[in-house]
A protein has these predicted regions:
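Substrate/ligand-engaging "lid" and interaction regions
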Residues: 1-30, 34-273
Length: 273
């Protein structure tokens, strides 16, 4: 059962599903051999084991493999890193976006936000029907849009919030000062993306949707979790440095970037790893 946040009426009852023990290779390979579609949401660090579990499978069809992971080209990268050849398996990369808050361990019920987005790389093979959630497009542009605007705002607000003694993301939307910082940050990130891709039409709507999502208290988005892995997230090609470089080249406003940089220099952030 999946209950959408803020909407008691949107409840989906999921039935007729089953599971296979991962160490039961015979049953696992038999089930995979009959598949039309194989997807994952196991974390990018586990994708190699997923690929390796398919090496000896004799597929009856030509299934599509899509890794729904928060990583650049998760599907194709995992396949290349595995350094294997799997006959008939089609690989498609996807940019996925949905916030899943901490779940109860007392049942199989899952509560998620109502918003969801899957943008698959536009290829002749289309494993899903297009809908409000699913679309096909330019993978590179969609990945950068999410990385810079959504993940970039997430990172800036995490450090700004921790420096202001906040614990959860939604607490940054409780007063005018923090709301102003949030809006200024996302406006700068949106500007950076438009400098990267001037043809995009939906950036303003995208920004408003992100602010609405981040302000939802039901998500329980812990700032210390968002701030983790700073060596990766502040990398030159990542969500902070890459848009900042573009803004600097165009003499644009970088005030919120400067604020976060000062926080990094002056605050005691030893709890972040």
């Amino acid at each position: 059962m999946s209950n959408f946040l803020n909407s008691k009426e949107n409840t989906l009852i999921v039935e007729n599903f089953s599971g296979i023990e991962l160490n039961n290779l015979a049953d696992l390979e038999l089930s995979l051999s009959k598949a039309d579609l194989i997807t994952t949401s196991v974390g990018p660090n586990h994708l190699l084991s997923v690929i390796n579990s398919m090496v000896n499978v004799e597929f009856e069809k030509s299934p599509v493999f899509v890794a729904f992971e928060n990583k650049y080209r998760a599907s194709s990268t995992a396949y290349k890193e595995a350094n294997v050849e799997i006959d008939k398996l089609e690989i498609i990369d996807a940019v996925v976006d949905k916030i899943v808050p901490p779940q109860s361990t007392e049942s199989l019920d899952v509560t998620v936000e109502e918003f969801g987005s899957i943008v698959l790389e536009d290829q002749p093979i289309k494993p899903f029907k297009s809908s409000e959630v699913v679309s096909y497009g330019d993978y590179e542009k969609e990945f950068i849009k999410k990385l810079w605007i959504l993940n970039g705002l997430h990172l800036q607000l995490a450090y700004y919030g921790l420096a202001n003694n906040k614990k959860f993301m939604h607490e940054l939307f409780d007063d005018s000062k923090n709301i102003e910082f949030s809006k200024n940050a996302i406006n700068s990130l949106g500007e950076a993306y438009l400098l990267f891709d001037r043809a995009t039409k939906d950036v303003d709507d995208y920004k408003e949707t992100i602010l609405k999502r981040f302000s939802a208290p039901e998500v329980k988005d812990e700032l210390i979790r968002v701030a983790r892995n700073p060596l990766i997230k502040f990398n030159k090609s990542e969500r902070f440095q890459a848009p900042l470089d573009l803004l600097l080249k165009n003499s644009s406003n970088i005030e919120t970037f400067q604020s976060v940089f000062q926080i990094l220099l002056n605050e005691d952030l030893d709890d972040i790893d």
